[in-house]
């Protein structure tokens, strides 16, 4: 009888030690860092159970003890509630923190930078190449985009997307992102339109955006934008053609090869401001906040001309003779730079 009791006692001790070791392993796993060496994007599909999750984490080399992982989920059931989604794991994260993240449903955010001065066609290309975007547009035609966005004025599309870094989660649609950018631009344009200076020669908000887009393409110097705007406003008021190269480039479309010839300037298009009077029918790029502000509040100047000064800025003039001299000065600066 004593031997039996001794054996039972020994078994209980062994089981106790084993249980203690098991619990230690579970706690150790819970507080250990993930095996990854860099940020890792992990997608948990809907309906994934505890076993499947452990196998996926092990297969992706995120954890190394799938069986102990299952013990952890049983011992701490609060950690076994996870939501489908795409998550970002970091090397500093523990297994417990990872499970808490999966429980929270806080999915990874991805950035999409829409830069001012670019066209909608550039943004559509970015969307096609961006990771984890759900593509729903049938093609990249502007008419298709306008229809998908249900625009009240389908022709008001180029230049009508707010340039910013837009954050999104996996499976966000291309249309959803474009709607966000469009909504913010509409709000900004409405504000600029309501607060615009008196007497500006714009027929509607689209002309304001069109002017802002031309300013955006003409100068990258924020402090000059209202002055550049004044040149174009002064020209519009006296019926003088705008004669701005970026409009020619836009009107040429895919024919533009990086260089403009005199023939290009003389070839009529709807956007060629060397051959048309007034503003083109729409924007030629996406304006930023500074250009939109300049279009709504141009400086009051007598200037009708401007040309690059070769130093990053522009020289402004009131008459053609002075302008031509400034052009020659600019060409001289370019020649000296090329000779170096």
From Swiss-Prot:
Subcellular location: Cell inner membrane
MF GO annotations: lytic endotransglycosylase activity
Primary subcellular site in the record, as a coarse category: membrane
E.C. no: 4.2.2.29
UniProt topology in membrane: Single-pass membrane protein
UniProt entry keywords in alphabetical sequence: Cell inner membrane, Cell membrane, Cell wall biogenesis/degradation, Lyase, Membrane, Transmembrane, Transmembrane helix
Cysteine pairs bridged by disulfides in the record: none
Cytoplasmic face residues: 1-3
Catalytic activity: a peptidoglycan chain = a peptidoglycan chain with N-acetyl-1,6-anhydromuramyl-[peptide] at the reducing end + a peptidoglycan chain with N-acetylglucosamine at the non-reducing end
Pfam families, sorted: YceG
Record CDD domains: MltG_like
Keyword Cell inner membrane: yes
Record-annotated site: Important for catalytic activity: 218
GO terms (BP aspect): cell wall organization; peptidoglycan biosynthetic process; peptidoglycan metabolic process
UniProt keyword 4Fe-4S, yes or no: no
Periplasmic side: 25-340
Annotated knockout phenotype: Inactivation leads to a significant increase in glycan strand length in the mature peptidoglycan matrix. Deletion mutant shows impaired membrane invagination and cytokinesis, and reduced sensitivity to ampicillin. Inactivation of the gene can restore growth to a strain with a lethal deficit in aPBP activity and a strain defective in the activity of the elongation system, which utilizes a SEDS/bPBP synthase.
GO cellular component, one term: plasma membrane
Transmembrane segments: 4-24
Family per similarity comment: Belongs to the transglycosylase MltG family.
Primary role: Functions as a peptidoglycan terminase that cleaves nascent peptidoglycan strands endolytically to terminate their elongation. Required for normal glycan strand length distribution. May function as a terminase for both classes of peptidoglycan (PG) synthases (aPBP and SEDS-bPBP synthases) by cleaving PG chains as they are being actively synthesized.
Subunit relationships: Homodimer. Interacts with PBP1b.
NCBIfam families linked to this entry: endolytic transglycosylase MltG, PRK10270.1
HAMAP family the record matches: MltG
Protein name: Endolytic murein transglycosylase
Organism: Escherichia coli (strain K12)
Gene that encodes it: mltG
């Amino acid at each position: 009888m004593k031997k039996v009791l001794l054996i039972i006692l020994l078994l209980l001790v062994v089981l106790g030690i084993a249980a203690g070791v098991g619990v230690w392993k579970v706690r150790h796993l819970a507080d250990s860092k993930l095996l990854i060496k860099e940020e890792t994007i992990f997608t948990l599909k809907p309906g994934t159970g505890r076993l499947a999750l452990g196998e996926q984490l092990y297969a992706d080399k995120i954890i190394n003890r799938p069986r102990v992982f299952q013990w952890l989920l049983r011992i701490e059931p609060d950690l076994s509630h996870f939501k489908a989604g795409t998550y970002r794991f970091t090397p500093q994260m523990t297994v417990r923190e990872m499970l808490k993240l999966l429980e929270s449903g806080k999915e990874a955010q991805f950035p999409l930078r829409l830069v001012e001065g670019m066209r909608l066609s550039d943004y559509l290309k970015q969307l096609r190449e961006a990771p984890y975007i759900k593509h729903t547009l049938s093609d990249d035609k502007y008419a298709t985009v306008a229809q998908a966005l249900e625009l009240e004025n389908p022709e008001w599309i180029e230049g009508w997307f707010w340039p910013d870094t837009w954050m999104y989660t996996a499976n966000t649609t291309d249309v959803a992102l474009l709607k966000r950018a469009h909504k913010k631009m509409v709000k900004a344009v409405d504000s600029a339109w309501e607060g615009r200076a008196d007497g500006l020669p714009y027929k509607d908000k689209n002309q304001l955006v069109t002017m802002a887009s031309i300013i955006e393409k003409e100068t990258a110097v924020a402090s000059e934008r209202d002055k550049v705007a004044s040149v174009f406003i002064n020209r519009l008021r006296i019926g003088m053609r705008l004669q701005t190269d970026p409009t020619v480039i836009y009107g040429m479309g895919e024919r533009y090869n990086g260089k403009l010839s005199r023939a290009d300037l003389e070839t009529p298009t709807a956007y060629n401001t060397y051959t048309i009077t007034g503003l083109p029918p729409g924007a030629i790029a996406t304006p930023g906040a500074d250009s939109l502000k300049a279009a709504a509040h141009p400086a009051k100047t007598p200037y009708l001309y401007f040309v690059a000064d070769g130093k990053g800025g522009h020289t402004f003039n009131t008459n053609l003779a002075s302008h031509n001299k400034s052009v020659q000065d600019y060409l001289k600066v370019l020649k000296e730079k090329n000779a170096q």
